[in-house]
Amino acid sequence: ARFVVAKANGASILLAPGCCQSVAKRAVTFKGTYGEGEAARTQPLTFSFDRPLNKKPFQILAHRGGGRTSDLLPASENSVEIIQLAERLGATGVEIDIRQTKDGTFIIYHDINLNLRLTQKTGLVGAIESYTYDQLSVFVRLFNGEKIPTLIESLDVILNQTALETVWLDSKDVRDMPRLRTIQQTYLQRAAQQGHRLNIYIGLPAQEQVTQFEQLPNHRQLPSICELDTSVAKRINATVWAPRWTLGQQIPSTVAMQQQGRKVFVWTLDVPEFIQQFIQNGSFDGILSNYVPSVAYYHYVQK
C-alpha cells in the first residue's frame, strides 16, 4: 500500500510548528491504494483522523523478545534480531527467557534442550546447560540463522538501539541469582545515566526462583515480577504481580495489588477477543502476548 497526505488534506497541519496538539476530526486524511499479494496497487483506501490515540500508561509486552519462532516472524524468538523488531510490532517492552550455560554464561533461550523447534540441525543434542557458551556460539544457530545471544548482548541492544521501557527477565534456569542481580543493577544505572526510561525486572515464575531471590541482600528493594499468588508478591515486595490470564480478570486481587503500589501484568494472552476484554476492563498495567500488534491495537483505540 502507498498513501499520500495532500496539502489540502492536512499536510500543512502535520508540518506546522507545534503540530497535533488539537487536530479537528477529519482534518487530516490519508489517501492511497493497495493491492492483494503481488497484484498492482489499484484498490483505493482512505483513512481520516478521528481522535487521538489512548494515552493511558500501559505496557505492551512482547513474549520471547518479540514473538515465537513458530509464528513465522522474520527473526527467531529470543534473538537480538527479534528484539530489534519488537517496537515495530507495537511493543513497549519485552520478556526474554534466561538460562545459564555450562560455564555460567547467561543466555536467552526458552527450552531446556536444543531442538529443531528453535534451532537448525546440528550435532549437539541434549540440555543447553551441558554446553559452554563458546560451544553454542560456534556450533548452534537459531531457526533463522541467528546466534543464541547472551543476556549482556540483549541488554546492550535494548539500551542502546531501542526505546523499549520494560524488560522482563524470565528466570527459566538461573543458578547464580546474585550475578543476575548485579547485571540488572548495572543496566538500570546505565539507563539512568543515558536518560533512557527503562525498568528491568527479575522474573520469578516458581517457588525455586523465589527462594533464590529471597536469599539476596535487600531483595525487597529489587525490581521483580512475581508469578505466584498475591501473598508471595506481598512478602517479597514484588514490583509487579503477574498472574496467568486463564485465572480470569481477578479484579479484587488486581485492585488490592495496585493499592499496595504494585503493577499488574497478565500473561500470556493471545486470543483477540480476550485481549479486548482485558483491556476494556481497564484494571491491568500491561499484557504479555505473542501477538503484540493485537494488544497495541485494542489499547490505542480504547476510549
Where do the language-model regions lie?
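Phosphate-group recognition and catalysis centered on beta-loop-alpha active-site segments
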Residues: 1-303
